[in-house]
Amino acid sequence: MQPLNGRSWSPIYESRPNSGGTYLVDEFYVPALERSVRYDRIAGYFSSTALAVASQGIDALLEHGGEMRLVVGTDLYKSDKPVLERLGDELRDSLEELDDEQLDAHLQLLARLLRENRLHIKVAVPREGSWQIFHPKMGIFHDDDDNALSFEGSVNETIGGWKRNYERFKVHRSWEDGEDAYVDADVDTFEQLWSNEHPFVEVYDLPEAIERELIDWKDPDSESEIKEAIQIARGEAPATELDKANIIADGPLTPGGLAL
């Protein structure tokens, strides 16, 4: 496995047009996962569609014996509910009973990570009553040489965040003087949250959050996002907007194309 400090990372990443929406995934998310043994993530929103988008990197993380720890807000997606609701102690065995063939591809990946104890999810709620939601967005990649790469910006752990929106975030490297203090602060914040020792935020294990009815099960932003995630998880490349435009433009040149 290549270490995190063996690659050149930009100080800032932002979405780029005409990349098919894959720039952040291809240039940052997957390469970072491929070099990591742990991925710690704080996000306002999480969806298993994000796992599908980065499935290549997730596979590499698993090959390294790695794991993911997520601290997320209370807004989770209805499409993930059939799997996430089985996390309670009395229901955890039912994860083994899920028929993967009856699950969409992105849910198969979610169920697999949970079964193998490679994905751990906690839910955060602000202690201050006037604060409506938990909304920070930060992540930390760790390799087996004790290097860490942290990022903070606008991107949520969803397909929309990594692929469909205009997003921008800054990156800090633990092995670079002047950047290590930012990484240390990010690690401290995450560990405070994970151990429920943050002064301003209450953190629950996901099964407890579900039992307390803290979760707001929201609809996906669009059905097309789910379909796109399924295609990616299956290894199928979804058509880009440019592809679609070319199909329409070339319509008259195709057999029967005058009907397009």
Q: What are the residue ranges of the model-derived segments?
A:
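PLD/PLD-like phosphodiesterase catalytic module centered on the HKD motif
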Residues: 1-258
